């Protein structure tokens, strides 16, 4: 499967899932993005169009992490959960953004659940 086909497939899945996955202020959308090297997570309120909380492997304390990308993704999940709980958010809607629920995506979700987010 060519790279163009993979990108088009992911975009179709992303568009299809966005219909049913909507975030509100009380239950925001946990949106993730996975690049080849990094992992990003955001809590988004779609009603007001605001990003409430962010976490990624690009932060200073995560840049020095030496381990696997899956371990780094788990830490990002724990960090987003800690920031969300500090902001008074416990329930979220998980948006995998067209990525398969496997590997780093699953590790981030598991880390967020371990730290106290409910989804």
Curated annotation (Swiss-Prot):
Region (Disordered): 1-23
GO molecular function: 5S rRNA binding; structural constituent of ribosome
Listed GO CC annotations: cytoplasm; ribonucleoprotein complex; ribosome
Cited InterPro entries: Ribosomal_uL18_bac-type, Ribosomal_uL18_bac/euk
UniProt KW rRNA-binding keyword: yes
Superkingdom: Bacteria
Statement: the UniProt record of this protein carries the keyword Ribonucleoprotein: yes
GO BP, sorted A to Z: translation
Assigned protein family: Belongs to the universal ribosomal protein uL18 family.
Protein's job: This is one of the proteins that bind and probably mediate the attachment of the 5S RNA into the large ribosomal subunit, where it forms part of the central protuberance.
This protein's name: Large ribosomal subunit protein uL18
Source organism: Chlorobium chlorochromatii (strain CaD3)
Gene for this chain: rplR
């Amino acid at each position: 499967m060519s790279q163009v086909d993979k990108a088009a497939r992911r975009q179709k899945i992303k568009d299809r899932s966005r219909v049913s996955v909507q975030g509100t202020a009380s239950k925001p959308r946990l949106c993730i993005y996975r690049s080849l090297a990094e992992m990003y997570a955001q809590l988004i309120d779609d009603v007001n169009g605001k990003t409430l909380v962010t976490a990624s492997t690009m932060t200073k304390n995560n840049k020095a992490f030496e381990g696997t990308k899956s371990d780094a993704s788990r830490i990002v999940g724990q960090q987003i959960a800690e920031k969300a709980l500090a902001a008074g958010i416990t329930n979220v809607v998980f948006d995998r953004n067209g990525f398969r629920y496997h590997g780093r995506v699953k590790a981030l979700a598991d880390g967020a659940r371990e730290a106290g987010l409910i989804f």
